Amino acid sequence: MSCYTREQIEAAVKAKGYAWFEGAKDFDVNIVGVRNSDTGNKVTNAFDDCITISYKEGGEWKSHCWPATTDPGKKGVQQYHNAAGVARLVEGQYRGSHTLGLHQGKYEALKQQKPVKVYRDPNRDLTYDENKIAEGVFGINIHKAGADSTYVENWSEGCQVFKKAADFESFMAVCRKAAAIHGKSFTYTLIESADIK
């Protein structure tokens, strides 16, 4: 899936009625994941989505778009750790849902701190079922895979995961600057590629 411009992301977010942050201070970030609509509910095991971040610095808009997954991988679907089934984040805007914190106690990432909605799929058939929704704090973090991972596998059991570690570090550098100005809470928005015109 190709990446998008800030204007495309902003228009799609506003069209959904979600907040778009553009305060007077620098680094009022908009973190938006874009799920690839073309793959439907099939487990592709690929980093075929993207994560974007848009913000102003010195009064000028800046934006970045990186390959990622917003879906669990094949191993995540088949070997999940929650008895209710693997989690797949429901599209929406989750205000203040994440904070700077350690992913699995290992390295700094954006860690879920407030409830989000997830689809739960317990049947391991490599098709995401969307008929059962749960809401809560499930550890749906925003983190990295390997240096440059090819397959999602169990890098995600519902987390939003960057394909490349270097891209994730660039993302986190912006988040740290944002936290120094606006505090450690971050809003995460997930949309579909079909939402982008």
Please provide the spans of the model-predicted regions.
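Cell wall/extracellular polymer interaction/catalysis modules
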Residues: 1-153, 167-176, 182-186, 191-195
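Residues immediately within or flanking Cys/His clusters that coordinate Zn2+
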Residues: 156
